[in-house]
Structure formats: structure tokens, C-alpha cells
């Protein structure tokens, strides 16, 4: 054993050993309980960032812990390799996305290996490889034939200069992010997954999962099951010119008597009709169509509208209600129309006040003296519970929410003007992307036969990999060698679909492919029934809705195809917090900011650790402290994991990541914290090194012990208890590390036999090995020559060690801590009082005064009141 801790040598040796012995190869074994631990796989962007390191270290700690507990562990890794960043990089660097992607994968794989993760690399999957995506193409054809996937027109953002479709986030102030051209809304044919067919099951099964409550709530809200009614407003034939009806869905039919107008989307047929001879309305509709349809933007944008001059008829009162075109109504939601009750909906209230539309109160509170003011919104206006009653509603006056709901819906049904309806906020998933770097959609368009799925024996439809996009549309649509084909049904010339799939499709089933990644006959084989579902899934909360919902949906699709036996993909979910760091910048003359990496800044702090001055290393001049934010390229506040590993070693990086904060909370980067982690590992190495220099021993099993030895063993076994609970139940690794540090502090100051010291050190090495596996490999080899750390079992708590002959009690004087005393575990009150009153520090703070009262809390403390 080397005298000094040398992380580089230790880590290389351990990693080579693990690779040579295939230490983490997962093999199905029906005789052992399995544990499938999965961290969300990375996009191969080029380099790992600290968020990756934190995510994968958490998964590795849990995987190694469960292996020590005797479980058959699977921890795989792969690459979410399709997507826009590769196309953007290809444009910038004039290189094929495939070459850029594969190069990044090789580098990032080296980085992951240097961190010592217990990954079974034989199960690696790469989603841009045909042997992966051929099976999602196969599933696509099956679902298309069953009607779960269908084709219909959808609205997209079209860049007329680049001749391409843009994602919502690529539209900036109504213009294309690259060309700067005004973006148009276009209707084009797209493919959709019928996820709404599974809405009820997706909602109900959330109750079976061990997920953070906030994630389950986010999914429930996204699915958005609501109970309401369809209400049909007959066309006013005098203004519209024909018979017909406008159907709207509302969750508040109880407020129908307060409806004063209806609003339709810019694409609605009534809007189109009204605009035919109205240039101002045409311009407004064009403006609406050019605007963002992203929900976040819709929620914050100013609500605008224009009257159409058309009217519909209120189904209960016969009143004529004006039809408005409004920018907050989307054609893709429901019927593209809403009824407006300004008095009891905050958005409608603001709109009605802006355009001087009628506001009719129909709800009042049963108790209190709250009055309705049509100029000022109050939260109680939107109340729907037993505390309200209807007013100004004719025969419905006095009814509460549920009574009014039922009565009004019954009357609508009697008039054939409406009925109860359960609706979902969730919409079917449009997966067509007019992009190159994605999985080709396996459909052939034939003039005679229509849309024909590619037969299974012609799959995969391989994406050409030697293409360098030029930014002007989808390259596949310009490649006759790709799209020219023959119809599988009639043999006539036909055209292959050139759209590719949303990259969320690949990440929706990768968890299942890991179970049998080499299966050449299907998406999965019988090995999936052994490994699935995933016992522990780890990733950022930013994926709480889309990725996690789509993966749950895919699991059910695969189950219904007979491929999987389980209903849900991920039994337990851990959402780790962000890695954050200080930001620094200087204001430039052009109004922008120059962000300066923290490594180039000299910081001065006050006694409480607050930054009071910051200067640039290069010129010594001040820089502005921008605050703590998520590590990012845009703020230049990232720390390169590779530099950290090279300076301190992977174990230091892992230890800091696990010690600095609980997994679910944000982790604030701290150079001092990294130094502290490194110092602890040096100290651990030194303790074991000095002990081993005196010769190793057999660990303590049974025998006579001194009081100090008993105290040390008590601390050891309570630490084992705590670390086991922190790892296996609470998943709070920072407190587990703190407990081991406390144990080592006691170890350092306790005289004990070599057998007891051996027991403590062996246990410490095993307890820490999931977090810092490299150093623990070396320390174990020194403590137990000839045995393998990975073959060990997690330490068991010795009940005998928890039985105390003596206990330590805290002693307070007037409620303030002044010392502690050790007494026999069965000591009586008199003995405890005498010991406390005889304590030197206690006598000092009593200052000769007699004790008015002595309070003894058994097993915990003594409080002397003077």
C-alpha cells in the first residue's frame, strides 16, 4: 500500500480490474432478486456536464448498494442520439450529424468510464443506429394498422426562407431563429399517436407508483381530466346566413346564464367567413396565426380580439350572443370555440372590460357581505362549491354549484342543446418532424393504395448517414434515391414518407431495450420479463411531464402488443436537483453582457461567506456578481468534470456530489467543498494505511470489551443502521456520509483492540464503497488481502452492540448545554443527579448556587435549574 493517497493510480487500476473481470455484467438469474436501476440517458452533445455527473453518481450509489445487499443488479447506459442539436452542429461545422454524434459518443463514453460507474456496457444502445430504430418502426406499422397511430392535418411553424418547420422554441418574436424571416402557420399532414385512448389508465396508474407527489400532480394536471358539458349554440341565421350550431365545452355549465359572448380561434370556419370581406379582421387573423401556440406564451401574452358581426343563440334564454375572434382560443383544443362568462372567469373578465362587453353576475356567496364589482376582479367570483348560490339566473336562482350544474345540463339535454361530458386536457401526440436527423417514418404513399405501412421484412427504413444539411428544408425530401420506391401492395411507383419521428419516441422505450439489446427478432425478448419494470429511475424534474408520460404510454402500448407484462415502466422515481454556481459578468458597450467563468475570478468573502468583492484574474478590475444560477454554457459558469477528475480524482467528484446536498435539492458548487471532500479521502487513506502498517487482524466477533470499545462498537452499528436507512429508504446520501465521518472521528480518539479497529475499518470501507468505489477497492485489498470487495455483503447490525452497559446523558444548566456524563444504563435517578452535580463544568456554571430543581429525562438529558 502506497504511503500517500494517489487517486489517479488507484482509479486507473480499479477501472482496469473491473473491465477485465466484467465485474458489472448483468446476467438473468431467477434464483436472485433483481434490481434494475436506470438514470436517464444523455444526449451526446460532446462533453459531460456536472448535471450528468450528479445524475449518474446517484444511480451508481444505489446500484452498488443494492449489489452489496445481494441483488442481481442491472445498470445500463446508452445514447439519446437523434435530435436538432446534431443538425445545428452539422450546419455550423459542415459535418454530417452522424459523424458528429458518433465522435461525441466515444468521448463521453470515455468520460463516464473514468468516473467508475458500475455500468454493463455490453447492453449499450444508441438510438440513431438502425438495429435500434428498426423496432420502433415495426411498432409504428403495427399501431398504424390498429388505428392507434393515424394521419391528419396539423398546424406548424413554417420558415419561408429556410423552407423548414420550426419548433415553438425556435420562433423568437414571430421570426425564425436562423433566417429572421416572419414565421407562417401552415397546415400539413402529420402522424399522431392516440395517447388520449389511454388517458384514464395513465391517470389511474399514477396511484400505483412511488413517485414524488409533485411529479404525479404535474402529470395529473397535464392529462387534465375534467367534468363538464358540451353546450350547443344555434347559429343566428340572420347574421351567419345559414343554419348550424357552435359547440363549446365548459366545466362551468352552472354559469351558463352569465354567458355574454363566445370566442373562436383564428382558424375557425366562422372566423374565416366573417373575414371574407373585412380586411381589418383578415389582418388580425393573420397576426393570430403568426403568434406562438406554446402554452407558456399563451398564458402570459396580452389577450386580444375582434368582433365578427356574427351571432349565435343562447340555448336557454334565446338571447343573441356576439361571436368574437380571440387570440387565446386555439383551434387544436376542443372545437376551437369557448363560451365567455366574464363575471366568473378571470381571463374573460379582463377581455370583457378591455372591449366593453357585458358582464353579468350569476354567482353570489351564501354568507357574508361580499359585493360584485364589474371593474375589479376578486377571487371569489370564480368559486365553485357549496358556499355559493346562483343569482340573476331565473328559475335556477338559489341553487349551489352542483345543483345548478345538474339542473342546467338536464335542461340542455331536454332541448337537445347539450349533455354532460368528461374531457381531457391531454391531446394526441403529433410525432411528425420535417427534419433529417431522426427515425424515418415507415409509410409509403401510393396514389392507388393510399398510406401503406412498410412491410416488416423491408424494415428498417435506413436513414442515410452521409448527409450534411444546408439548412433549407429536409434533405430527405430532396433525395430521390431515398423517397422513390414502389408500393408494397400494388407494385406501382410510390413515394416514401420523408418526415422523421419526434425524438421523444426513441426515449419512450429505451428502458425496455436494455433488457435484451442484442435481440434481432423483436423489440424485446423474454429477458424483459425478468428485468422489467425499472425499480429505480433517476432524472431531472424537467422531464416530469412529456418524457415520463410518453414512456408510460409506450409501456402500455408494448404491453398490449404482448411484448411486456408490466403496466408501468418506472416503479420508483428520484428527481435530482440542479447543479448551480455563481455567475460573473461585465456589461459591454452594446448593452449585452460578457459572462466570465468563475475560474477566472478572484473572490473576497466576509465572515459569513458572502461575496463582498470580485475581480478578474487577468486585469484585476471588478466584475459584477450575477448571483447563483444553473450551470450553463450561456452564463459561462460551468465546471468541467474532466478537469476536476484530473486534479482530484473521480472519487472526490463523486463524494462532493453526494455530500454537498440531498439528491432532490439544488447543489451549489463550492471549490472549498471539493477541497474538503479530497481532504477527507486523504484522511481515510491515511487512517487505513497507518492501521495496516501494524498488521491486519481478524475482525471482532465476540469477547470481552472495554467501555471505550463498547462505545465505539455502539457507534459503528448505529452508523450501519443509519447509512442503511439513508441509502435504502430515504435516499439521503449526505447524511450517510456525515454519519461515517462522525464514526471515524470517534475511531481516531478511541483506544481499542485491533480486532475492534479491524471491524470498524472493514465496515467503513464497505459503507463508503458505493460512493467512492476506487479508493475502497485499494483499502479493502489492504485490509483483507486475497478477498474481493465486490463479493462482500452489506454490513449487518449486531444487536448485541446496541445493548449499552453505560449511557451518555447531556447535562444542562438552566437549559444551556454545559457537558455530559456517563452512567450505568440502569442507573437510578439519585445516581444520575449526583453524577451531573459533580461535573466540573456544571459546578462552574452553577457558581456555588444550590439547585432549585433537577429534571431528568431518562436516556437523554439532565437539566439543573439554579
Curated annotation (Swiss-Prot):
GO terms for cellular component: cytosol. A motif ('KMSKS' region) lies at residues 630-634. One of its GO terms (biological process) is leucyl-tRNA aminoacylation. It catalyses: tRNA(Leu) + L-leucine + ATP = L-leucyl-tRNA(Leu) + AMP + diphosphate. It is found in: Cytoplasm. It comes from the Bacteria. The keyword Ribonucleoprotein does not apply. A motif ('HIGH' region) lies at residues 42-52. Keywords: Aminoacyl-tRNA synthetase, ATP-binding, Cytoplasm, Ligase, Nucleotide-binding, Protein biosynthesis. It holds the Pfam family tRNA-synt_1. Its EC number is 6.1.1.4. ATP binds at residue 633. The keyword Lyase does not apply. One of its GO terms (molecular function) is leucine-tRNA ligase activity. Belongs to the class-I aminoacyl-tRNA synthetase family. PANTHER family: LEUCINE--TRNA LIGASE, MITOCHONDRIAL, LEUCYL-TRNA SYNTHETASE. NCBIfam families: leuS_bact. This is Leucine--tRNA ligase.
Amino acid at each position: 500500500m502506497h504511503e500517500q493517497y494517489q487517486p489517479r493510480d488507484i482509479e486507473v487500476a480499479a477501472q482496469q480490474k473491473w473491465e477485465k473481470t466484467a465485474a458489472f455484467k448483468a446476467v438473468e438469474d431467477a434464483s436472485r432478486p433483481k434490481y434494475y436501476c436506470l438514470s436517464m440517458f444523455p444526449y451526446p452533445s460532446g462533453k459531460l456536464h456536472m448535471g450528468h455527473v450528479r445524475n449518474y453518481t446517484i444511480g451508481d450509489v444505489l446500484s452498488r448498494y443494492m449489489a452489496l445487499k445481494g441483488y442481481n443488479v442491472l445498470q445500463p447506459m446508452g445514447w439519446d442520439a437523434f435530435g436538432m442539436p446534431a443538425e445545428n452542429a452539422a450546419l455550423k461545422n459542415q459535418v454530417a450529424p452522424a459523424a458528429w454524434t458518433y465522435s461525441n459518443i466515444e468521448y463521453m463514453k470515455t468520460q463516464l468510464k473514468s468516473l467508475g460507474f458500475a455500468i454493463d456496457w455490453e447492453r449499450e444502445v444508441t438510438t440513431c443506429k438502425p438495429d435500434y430504430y428498426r423496432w420502433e418502426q415495426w411498432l409504428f406499422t403495427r399501431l398504424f394498422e390498429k388505428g392507434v397511430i393515424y394521419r391528419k392535418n396539423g398546424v406548424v411553424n413554417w420558415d419561408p426562407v429556410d423552407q423548414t418547420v420550426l419548433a415553438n422554441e425556435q420562433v423568437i418574436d414571430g421570426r425564425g431563429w436562423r433566417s429572421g424571416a416572419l414565421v407562417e402557420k401552415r397546415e400539413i399532414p402529420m402522424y399522431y399517436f392516440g395517447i388520449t385512448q389511454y388517458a384514464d389508465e395513465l391517470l389511474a396508474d399514477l396511484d400505483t407508483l412511488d413517485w414524488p407527489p409533485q411529479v404525479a400532480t404535474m402529470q395529473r394536471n397535464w392529462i387534465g381530466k375534467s367534468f363538464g358539458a358540451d353546450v350547443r349554440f344555434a347559429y343566428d341565421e340572420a347574421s351567419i346566413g345559414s343554419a348550424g350550431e357552435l359547440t363549446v365545452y365548459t366545466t362551468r355549465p352552472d354559469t351558463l346564464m352569465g354567458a355574454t359572448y363566445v370566442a373562436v380561434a383564428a382558424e375557425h370556419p366562422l372566423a374565416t367567413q366573417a373575414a371574407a370581406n373585412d380586411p381589418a379582421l383578415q389582418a388580425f387573423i393573420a397576426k393570430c396565426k403568426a403568434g406562438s401556440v406554446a402554452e407558456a406564451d399563451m398564458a402570459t401574452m396580452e389577450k386580444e380580439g375582434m368582433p365578427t358581426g356574427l351571432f349565435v343563440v343562447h340555448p336557454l334564454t334565446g338571447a343573441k350572443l356576439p361571436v368574437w375572434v380571440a387570440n387565446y382560443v386555439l383551434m387544436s383544443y376542443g372545437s376551437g370555440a369557448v363560451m365567455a362568462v366574464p363575471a366568473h372567469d378571470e381571463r374573460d373578465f379582463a377581455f370583457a372590460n378591455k372591449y366593453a362587453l357585458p358582464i353579468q353576475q350569476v354567482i353570489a356567496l351564501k354568507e357574508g357581505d361580499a359585493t360584485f364589482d364589474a371593474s375589479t376582479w376578486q377571487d371569489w367570483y370564480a368559486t365553485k362549491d357549496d358556499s355559493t348560490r346562483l343569482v340573476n339566473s331565473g328559475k335556477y336562482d338559489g341553487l349551489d354549484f352542483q345543483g345548478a350544474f345538474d339542473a342546467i345540463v338536464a335542461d340542455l339535454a331536454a332541448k337537445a342543446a347539450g349533455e354532460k361530458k368528461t374531457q381531457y386536457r391531454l391531446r394526441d401526440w403529433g410525432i411528425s418532424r420535417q427534419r433529417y436527423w431522426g427515425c424515418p417514418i415507415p409509410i409509403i404513399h401510393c396514389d392507388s393504395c393510399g398510406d401503406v405501412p412498410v412491410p416488416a421484412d423491408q424494415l428498417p427504413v435506413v436513414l442515410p448517414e452521409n448527409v450534411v444539411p444546408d439548412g433549407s428544408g429536409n434533405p430527405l425530401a430532396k433525395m430521390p434515391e431515398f423517397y422513390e420506391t414502389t408500393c408494397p401492395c400494388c407494385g406501382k411507383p410510390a413515394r416514401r414518407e420523408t418526415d422523421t419521428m419526434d425524438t421523444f419516441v426513441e426515449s419512450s422505450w429505451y428502458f425496455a431495450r436494455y433488457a435484451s439489446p442484442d435481440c434481432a427478432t423483436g423489440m424485446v425478448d423474454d429477458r424483459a420479463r425478468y428485468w422489467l419494470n425499472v425499480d429505480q429511475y433517476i432524472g431531472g424534474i424537467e422531464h416530469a411531464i412529456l418524457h415520463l408520460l410518453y414512456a408510460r404510454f409506450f409501456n402500455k402500448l408494448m404491453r398490449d402488443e404482448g411484448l411486456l407484462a408490466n403496466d408501468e415502466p418506472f416503479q420508483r422515481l428520484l428527481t435530482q436537483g440542479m447543479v448551480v454556481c455563481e455567475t460573473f459578468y461585465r456589461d459591454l458597450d452594446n448593452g449585452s453582457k460578457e459572462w466570465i467563468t468563475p475560474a477566472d475570478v478572484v473572490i473576497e468573502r466576509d465572515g459569513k461567506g458572502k461575496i463582498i468583492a470580485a475581480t478578474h484574474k487577468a486585469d484585476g478590475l471588478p466584475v459584477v456578481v450575477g448571483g447563483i444560477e444553473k450551470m450553463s454554457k450561456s452564463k459561462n459558469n460551468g465546471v468541467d468534470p474532466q478537469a476536476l477528475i484530473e486534479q482530484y480524482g473521480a472519487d472526490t467528484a463523486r463524494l462532493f456530489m453526494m455530500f454537498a446536498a440531498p439528491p432532490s435539492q439544488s447543489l451549489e458548487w463550492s471549490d472549498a467543498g471539493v477541497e474538503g471532500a479530497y481532504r477527507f479521502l486523504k484522511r481515510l487513506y491515511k487512517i487505513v494505511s497507518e492501521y495496516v502498517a501494524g498488521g491486519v487482524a481478524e475482525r471482532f466477533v465476540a469477547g470481552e470489551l472495554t467501555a471505550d470499545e463498547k462505545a465505539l462498537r455502539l457507534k459503528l452499528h448505529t452508523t450501519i443502521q443509519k447509512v442503511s436507512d439513508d441509502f435504502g429508504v430515504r435516499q439521503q446520501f449526505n447524511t450517510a456520509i456525515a454519519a461515517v465521518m462522525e464514526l471515524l472521528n470517534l475511531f481516531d480518539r478511541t483506544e481499542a483492540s485491533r480486532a475492534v479497529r479491524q471491524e470498524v475499518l472493514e465496515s467503513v470501507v464497505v459503507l463508503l464503497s458505493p460512493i467512492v468505489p476506487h479508493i475502497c477497492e485499494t483499502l479493502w485489498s489492504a485490509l483483507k488481502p486475497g478477498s474481493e470487495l465486490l463479493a462482500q455483503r452489506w454490513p449487518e447490525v449486531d444487536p448485541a452492540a446496541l445493548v449499552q452497559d453505560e449511557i451518555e446523558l447531556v447535562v444542562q444548566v438552566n437549559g444551556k448545554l454545559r457537558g455530559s456524563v456517563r452512567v450505568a444504563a440502569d442507573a437510578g435517578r439519585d445516581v444520575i443527579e449526583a453524577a451531573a452535580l459533580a461535573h466540573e463544568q456544571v459546578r462552574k456554571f452553577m457558581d456555588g448556587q444550590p439547585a432549585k430543581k433537577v429534571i431528568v429525562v431518562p436516556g437523554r438529558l439532565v437539566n439543573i435549574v439554579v
